């Protein structure tokens, strides 16, 4: 209520999984556990709606468990949630959105956060299985079909989460706190498919990604990153 009194909306971001886990965790879930996760997400959203929260955001970015289901580099399942095709990869994400919509109704806002493009920062050039922009476009279309109301995009770097939302940190040197493996001379044209705009800092660097995603969906599309008033 205090948030609403100040003229703002109240929401919570959902991330899947147990405390920090090996990146193979996605392959260890049983189908029964996956179905329970779907139900739990819907129930958690309903419990937030009841006291007055306006929205939830499902985080399918960085290297969270939900993102691992989307990634061919980490998802080695051989069932309907495996990475054999795009439909299977996005299945869990869609089921969660649909369950939240079922439990919370049409007047509850569901936001989503995805990696629009990924790159391996620990072994530069070895990007086999990482999400590319065309895959993210398909993902965005499927999230809209499932009932999402908004899509937020950023880049994904499995080695260090900080550069996913603070792209300026791509410039920091390796072995420094919060640094990535890209080194101190970061050439935006040579990384992430050239999709970031090096003229801007913070969320502004992701505007080209949002523009590409917006071309294939009717939903609002935003950039997830820190705000820099200079850009």
Label every PLM stretch briefly.
Residues 1-231:
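Flavin-dependent oxidoreductase catalytic cores
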């Amino acid at each position: 209520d205090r948030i609403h009194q100040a003229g703002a909306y109240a929401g919570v971001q959902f991330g899947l999984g147990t405390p920090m886990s090996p990146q193979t965790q996605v392959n260890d879930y049983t189908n029964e556990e996956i179905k329970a996760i779907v139900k739990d997400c819907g129930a958690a959203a309903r419990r937030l709606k009841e006291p007055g929260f306006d929205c939830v955001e499902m985080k399918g970015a960085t290297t969270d468990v939900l993102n691992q289901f989307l990634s061919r580099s980490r998802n080695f399942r051989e069932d309907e949630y495996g990475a054999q095709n795009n439909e299977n990869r996005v299945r869990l994400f869609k089921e969660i959105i649909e369950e939240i919509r079922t439990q919370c109704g049409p007047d509850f806002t569901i936001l989503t956060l995805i990696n629009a493009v990924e790159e391996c920062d620990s072994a530069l050039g070895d990007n086999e299985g990482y999400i590319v922009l065309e895959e993210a476009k398909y993902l965005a279309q499927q999230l809209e079909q499932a009932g999402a109301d908004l899509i937020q995009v950023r880049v994904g770097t499995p080695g260090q989460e900080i550069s996913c939302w603070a792209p300026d940190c791509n410039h920091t040197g390796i072995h420094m706190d919060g640094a990535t493996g890209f080194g101190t001379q970061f050439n935006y044209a040579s990384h992430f498919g050239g999709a970031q705009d090096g003229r801007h800092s913070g969320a502004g660097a992701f505007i080209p990604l949002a523009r590409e995603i917006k071309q294939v969906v009717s939903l609002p599309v935003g950039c997830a990153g820190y705000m820099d008033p200079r850009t």
